[in-house]
Amino acid sequence: KKGLSIPKNMYTKWFDCDKIKGTPVVRTRQTGDYITLAGGSKKALRRFMIDEKIPADMRDQVALLADGDHIMWVIGWRISSYYKIGPDTKRVLQVKIKKEEQ
């Protein structure tokens, strides 16, 4: 998608596939987006970006992997603790993000 800010190198992350409710999509932020932090607390994506000191002029361009309004991965920053694989994980989704050479 044009205008997405994707880190220059490749990233690979793994997610607990059975926790995904919809079809994950890569997109930019939308109203109502949230991420789950360690301990299970939810944080509005807007507040997460402020706390992580993501520059305001970049926030609308940061690439996200989203399951509805639940952010699975703020690409280049953090994955949601909700989707992390653990001892009870049966199926794993591997996601690779690589910026295409121009």
Where do the language-model regions lie?
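Basic, glycine-rich polyanion-binding accessory segments appended to enzymes
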Residues: 1-102
